[in-house]
Protein backbone atom coordinates (compact mmCIF):
# COMPACT_ATOMS: atom_id res chain seq x y z
CA UNK A 1 0.00 0.00 0.00
CA UNK A 2 1.49 3.33 -1.04
CA UNK A 3 1.10 6.00 1.65
CA UNK A 4 -1.10 8.85 0.50
CA UNK A 5 0.33 11.41 2.91
CA UNK A 6 3.65 12.02 1.10
CA UNK A 7 4.15 15.43 -0.47
CA UNK A 8 5.60 15.73 -3.97
CA UNK A 9 5.25 19.50 -4.36
CA UNK A 10 8.87 20.16 -3.30
CA UNK A 11 10.42 17.92 -6.03
CA UNK A 12 10.48 18.55 -9.78
CA UNK A 13 8.91 15.87 -11.96
CA UNK A 14 11.38 13.90 -14.08
CA UNK A 15 10.96 14.19 -17.88
CA UNK A 16 9.48 11.17 -19.61
CA UNK A 17 11.30 9.02 -22.18
CA UNK A 18 9.33 10.57 -25.03
CA UNK A 19 10.22 14.12 -23.99
CA UNK A 20 13.91 13.25 -23.72
CA UNK A 21 13.87 11.57 -27.16
CA UNK A 22 12.18 14.62 -28.72
CA UNK A 23 14.76 16.95 -27.16
CA UNK A 24 17.62 14.79 -28.44
CA UNK A 25 16.11 14.75 -31.95
CA UNK A 26 15.72 18.55 -31.92
CA UNK A 27 19.31 18.91 -30.75
CA UNK A 28 20.45 16.67 -33.61
CA UNK A 29 18.49 18.72 -36.16
CA UNK A 30 19.98 21.96 -34.81
CA UNK A 31 23.47 20.47 -35.07
CA UNK A 32 22.73 19.46 -38.63
CA UNK A 33 21.56 22.97 -39.45
CA UNK A 34 24.63 24.56 -37.85
CA UNK A 35 26.99 22.16 -39.55
CA UNK A 36 25.33 22.50 -42.95
CA UNK A 37 25.37 26.30 -42.69
CA UNK A 38 29.04 26.48 -41.81
CA UNK A 39 29.97 24.01 -44.56
CA UNK A 40 27.99 25.94 -47.16
CA UNK A 41 29.76 29.17 -46.24
CA UNK A 42 33.13 27.48 -46.57
CA UNK A 43 32.23 25.78 -49.86
CA UNK A 44 31.06 29.05 -51.47
CA UNK A 45 34.56 30.43 -50.99
CA UNK A 46 36.24 27.31 -52.49
CA UNK A 47 36.24 25.81 -55.91
CA UNK A 48 33.50 23.49 -57.23
CA UNK A 49 35.67 20.43 -56.58
CA UNK A 50 36.21 21.30 -52.99
CA UNK A 51 32.49 21.98 -52.68
CA UNK A 52 31.64 18.39 -53.65
CA UNK A 53 34.24 16.96 -51.31
CA UNK A 54 33.03 19.14 -48.45
CA UNK A 55 29.43 18.03 -48.94
CA UNK A 56 30.46 14.38 -48.80
CA UNK A 57 32.46 14.93 -45.64
CA UNK A 58 29.61 16.90 -44.05
CA UNK A 59 27.05 14.20 -44.80
CA UNK A 60 29.39 11.56 -43.39
CA UNK A 61 29.94 13.60 -40.24
CA UNK A 62 26.21 14.11 -39.87
CA UNK A 63 25.58 10.40 -40.28
CA UNK A 64 28.24 9.63 -37.67
CA UNK A 65 26.72 12.22 -35.37
CA UNK A 66 23.25 10.75 -35.88
CA UNK A 67 24.52 7.27 -35.15
CA UNK A 68 26.14 8.44 -31.94
CA UNK A 69 22.99 10.25 -30.91
CA UNK A 70 20.93 7.15 -31.75
CA UNK A 71 23.27 5.00 -29.68
CA UNK A 72 23.13 7.53 -26.89
CA UNK A 73 19.32 7.55 -27.03
CA UNK A 74 19.22 3.77 -27.00
CA UNK A 75 21.55 3.65 -24.01
CA UNK A 76 19.54 6.37 -22.34
CA UNK A 77 16.30 4.49 -23.02
CA UNK A 78 17.81 1.28 -21.68
CA UNK A 79 18.94 3.10 -18.54
CA UNK A 80 15.49 4.60 -18.15
CA UNK A 81 13.89 1.16 -18.59
CA UNK A 82 16.25 -0.31 -16.01
CA UNK A 83 15.50 2.56 -13.64
CA UNK A 84 11.77 2.14 -14.19
CA UNK A 85 11.99 -1.62 -13.67
CA UNK A 86 14.00 -1.10 -10.49
CA UNK A 87 11.51 1.48 -9.26
CA UNK A 88 8.66 -0.84 -10.17
CA UNK A 89 10.26 -3.71 -8.25
CA UNK A 90 10.91 -1.45 -5.27
CA UNK A 91 7.32 -0.20 -5.46
CA UNK A 92 6.02 -3.77 -5.63
CA UNK A 93 8.21 -4.79 -2.71
CA UNK A 94 7.14 -1.74 -0.73
CA UNK A 95 3.49 -2.39 -1.61
CA UNK A 96 3.74 -6.06 -0.58
CA UNK A 97 5.50 -5.13 2.65
CA UNK A 98 2.97 -2.40 3.35
CA UNK A 99 0.07 -4.78 2.63
CA UNK A 100 1.64 -7.44 4.84
CA UNK A 101 2.15 -4.94 7.65
CA UNK A 102 -1.39 -3.61 7.22
CA UNK A 103 -2.81 -7.13 7.23
CA UNK A 104 -0.84 -7.98 10.36
CA UNK A 105 -2.07 -4.80 12.04
CA UNK A 106 -5.64 -5.52 11.00
CA UNK A 107 -5.34 -9.12 12.22
CA UNK A 108 -3.93 -7.92 15.54
CA UNK A 109 -6.68 -5.31 15.88
CA UNK A 110 -9.34 -7.88 14.97
CA UNK A 111 -7.84 -10.38 17.42
CA UNK A 112 -7.74 -7.80 20.21
CA UNK A 113 -11.30 -6.70 19.47
CA UNK A 114 -12.44 -10.32 19.36
CA UNK A 115 -10.78 -11.02 22.72
CA UNK A 116 -12.33 -7.89 24.21
CA UNK A 117 -15.76 -8.87 22.87
CA UNK A 118 -15.41 -12.40 24.26
CA UNK A 119 -14.26 -11.05 27.61
CA UNK A 120 -17.13 -8.56 27.74
CA UNK A 121 -19.63 -11.21 26.66
CA UNK A 122 -18.36 -13.66 29.27
CA UNK A 123 -18.43 -11.01 32.00
CA UNK A 124 -21.97 -9.85 31.26
CA UNK A 125 -23.15 -13.38 30.48
CA UNK A 126 -22.03 -14.45 33.94
CA UNK A 127 -23.74 -11.44 35.50
CA UNK A 128 -26.94 -12.10 33.55
CA UNK A 129 -26.80 -15.79 34.48
CA UNK A 130 -26.41 -14.92 38.16
CA UNK A 131 -29.27 -12.44 37.98
CA UNK A 132 -31.54 -14.90 36.19
CA UNK A 133 -30.73 -17.58 38.76
CA UNK A 134 -31.54 -15.16 41.57
CA UNK A 135 -34.69 -14.19 39.71
CA UNK A 136 -35.75 -17.84 39.49
CA UNK A 137 -35.08 -18.29 43.19
CA UNK A 138 -37.07 -15.14 44.00
CA UNK A 139 -39.91 -16.31 41.78
CA UNK A 140 -39.96 -19.69 43.51
CA UNK A 141 -39.98 -17.98 46.90
CA UNK A 142 -42.75 -15.65 45.74
CA UNK A 143 -44.79 -18.59 44.47
CA UNK A 144 -44.25 -20.45 47.74
CA UNK A 145 -45.20 -17.35 49.71
CA UNK A 146 -48.22 -16.83 47.49
CA UNK A 147 -49.25 -20.44 48.03
CA UNK A 148 -48.82 -20.01 51.78
CA UNK A 149 -50.87 -16.83 51.71
CA UNK A 150 -53.52 -18.55 49.61
CA UNK A 151 -53.65 -21.44 52.07
CA UNK A 152 -53.75 -19.00 54.97
CA UNK A 153 -56.50 -17.05 53.24
CA UNK A 154 -58.47 -20.24 52.70
CA UNK A 155 -57.94 -21.17 56.33
CA UNK A 156 -58.95 -17.69 57.46
CA UNK A 157 -61.97 -17.83 55.19
CA UNK A 158 -62.90 -21.20 56.61
CA UNK A 159 -62.42 -19.93 60.15
CA UNK A 160 -64.44 -16.84 59.32
CA UNK A 161 -67.23 -18.96 57.87
CA UNK A 162 -67.17 -21.20 60.92
CA UNK A 163 -67.16 -18.14 63.14
CA UNK A 164 -70.16 -16.74 61.29
CA UNK A 165 -71.96 -20.05 61.69
CA UNK A 166 -71.14 -20.12 65.40
CA UNK A 167 -72.16 -16.48 65.81
CA UNK A 168 -75.37 -17.17 63.96
CA UNK A 169 -76.04 -20.12 66.23
CA UNK A 170 -75.17 -18.05 69.28
CA UNK A 171 -77.45 -15.27 68.11
CA UNK A 172 -80.22 -17.75 67.48
CA UNK A 173 -79.70 -19.22 70.94
CA UNK A 174 -79.74 -15.76 72.48
CA UNK A 175 -82.92 -14.93 70.63
CA UNK A 176 -84.53 -18.17 71.76
CA UNK A 177 -83.39 -17.61 75.32
CA UNK A 178 -84.68 -14.08 75.25
CA UNK A 179 -87.99 -15.25 73.95
CA UNK A 180 -88.09 -17.89 76.66
CA UNK A 181 -87.20 -15.27 79.24
CA UNK A 182 -89.97 -12.96 78.04
CA UNK A 183 -92.43 -15.81 78.05
CA UNK A 184 -91.31 -16.93 81.49
CA UNK A 185 -91.65 -13.38 82.77
CA UNK A 186 -95.10 -13.12 81.32
CA UNK A 187 -96.04 -16.46 82.81
CA UNK A 188 -94.57 -15.41 86.13
CA UNK A 189 -96.47 -12.14 86.06
CA UNK A 190 -99.66 -13.97 85.29
CA UNK A 191 -98.94 -16.46 88.03
CA UNK A 192 -98.20 -13.66 90.46
CA UNK A 193 -101.36 -11.92 89.46
CA UNK A 194 -103.32 -15.12 89.92
CA UNK A 195 -101.69 -15.73 93.29
CA UNK A 196 -102.33 -12.16 94.34
CA UNK A 197 -105.89 -12.37 93.15
CA UNK A 198 -106.34 -15.65 94.98
CA UNK A 199 -104.74 -14.24 98.11
CA UNK A 200 -106.92 -11.19 97.93
CA UNK A 201 -109.97 -13.34 97.48
CA UNK A 202 -108.93 -15.52 100.43
CA UNK A 203 -108.21 -12.43 102.44
CA UNK A 204 -111.60 -11.01 101.54
CA UNK A 205 -113.22 -14.25 102.48
CA UNK A 206 -111.34 -14.37 105.78
CA UNK A 207 -112.14 -10.74 106.43
CA UNK A 208 -115.80 -11.43 105.72
CA UNK A 209 -115.77 -14.47 107.98
CA UNK A 210 -113.92 -12.55 110.63
CA UNK A 211 -116.32 -9.69 110.36
CA UNK A 212 -119.22 -12.10 110.52
CA UNK A 213 -117.71 -13.84 113.54
CA UNK A 214 -117.15 -10.54 115.26
CA UNK A 215 -120.69 -9.53 114.58
CA UNK A 216 -121.96 -12.81 115.96
CA UNK A 217 -119.85 -12.49 119.08
CA UNK A 218 -121.01 -8.93 119.57
CA UNK A 219 -124.60 -9.95 119.24
CA UNK A 220 -123.99 -12.78 121.65
CA UNK A 221 -122.50 -10.45 124.21
CA UNK A 222 -125.37 -8.03 124.00
CA UNK A 223 -127.77 -10.92 124.39
CA UNK A 224 -126.22 -12.08 127.60
CA UNK A 225 -126.43 -8.64 129.05
From Swiss-Prot:
Residues 68-73 are annotated as: Important for oligomerization and fiber formation. Transmembrane segments: none annotated. Residues 1-59 are annotated as: Disordered. Its main location: nucleus. The modification Phosphoserine is found at residues 36, 38. Phosphorylated. It is found in: Nucleus; Chromosome; Chromosome, Centromere. Disulfide bonds: none annotated. Residues 44-53 have a biased composition (Basic and acidic residues). This is Synaptonemal complex protein 3. It comes from Bos taurus (Bovine). The gene is SYCP3.
Amino acid sequence: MVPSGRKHSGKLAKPSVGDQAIRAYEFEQEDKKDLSGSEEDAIEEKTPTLEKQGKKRTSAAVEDMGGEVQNMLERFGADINKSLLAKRKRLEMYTKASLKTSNQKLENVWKIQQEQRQKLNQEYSQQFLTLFQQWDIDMQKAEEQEEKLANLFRQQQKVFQQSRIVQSQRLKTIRQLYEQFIKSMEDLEKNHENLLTGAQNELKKEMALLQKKIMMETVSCYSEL
